[in-house]
Amino acid sequence: MSEPIDLSQIAPTLKAEILAEALPYIRRYHGKSVVIKYGGNAMTEERLKQGFARDVILLKLVGINPVIVHGGGPQIDHALKKIGKAGTFIQGMRVTDEETMEVVEWVLGGEVQQDIVMLINHFGGHAVGLTGKDGGLIHARKLLMPDRDNPGQYIDIGQVGEVEAINPAVVKALQDDAFIPVISPIGFGEDGLSYNINADLVAGKLATVLNAEKLLMMTNIPGVMDKDGNLLTDLSAREIDALFEDGTISGGMLPKISSALDAAKSGVKSVHIVDGRIEHSVLLEILTEQPFGTMIRSH
């Protein structure tokens, strides 16, 4: 086991201030679910990975219920490259043929998920990994991608799905038994096929079904940026629509912001996009007053 975080260099008065600042937030979120979409640099840099594992353990210890939905795009790209296959994206979604789907299942449900679970358990937490196929968690249907150049037409991007329904029973059972669920965004369809679902979309739908107090989406940028590179700290639904229209929000940010906005409109009380490159970004956002990232509002 690794040594615990060394707080010996922090002055006692500062420690007290940190704890005092966190107290009202611990009260607010105690017993509530917080869904975290985990991805980007936070999943690949060892220092950030360890910090994230410790963060979610601390949340659980103070009575908050973190639920992790992870991505794994870079790891999938690496695995595809090893077999001589290039990744293709349309409107931020990975084109997923049968061979790619096999790689996605192996990478997300195996390598990536187990790395997260083992690290949390290594630092003293109790994490359990599952995919959307376990316990009937995520029912999926094939995603029909609208062709923007041909209205009324759709693009076939293979075994890419969208969430048809979520059965949260297995997640709630794990929470009740003091486990931290770690979920790979793979669903199953009525046609018997597995479907690759964007992790942002799964996180948003899961937060809604769990009636989560907060949805936190980690990125490799400070938050939502305007065209001049300035951070937008607070966005309403109307402002987001305008950013979609003028192309400010594009590529991989499209499903992320769409999912965040849908969650806010569906009753998730607090939705934030945060910079996962900052160590302990999860704790900073949830347990401090520090303005951080971009808040998404439904009105």
From Swiss-Prot:
Main location: cytoplasm
Protein name (Swiss-Prot/TrEMBL): Acetylglutamate kinase
Pathway in which the depicted protein is active: Amino-acid biosynthesis; L-arginine biosynthesis; N(2)-acetyl-L-ornithine from L-glutamate: step 2/4
EC number(s) on file: 2.7.2.8
Pfam family, one: AA_kinase
InterPro entries according to UniProt: AceGlu_kinase-like_sf, AcgluKinase_fam, ArgB, Asp/Glu/Uridylate_kinase, NAGK-C
List of residues binding substrate: G72, G73, R94, N196
PANTHER family: N-ACETYLGLUTAMATE SYNTHASE, N-ACETYLGLUTAMATE SYNTHASE, MITOCHONDRIAL
Gene: argB
Gene Ontology cellular component terms for the protein in this record: cytoplasm
HAMAP family assigned: ArgB (MF_00082)
Record localization: Cytoplasm
GO molecular function ontology, one term from the record: ATP binding
Signal sequence interval, chain numbering: none
Functional note: Catalyzes the ATP-dependent phosphorylation of N-acetyl-L-glutamate.
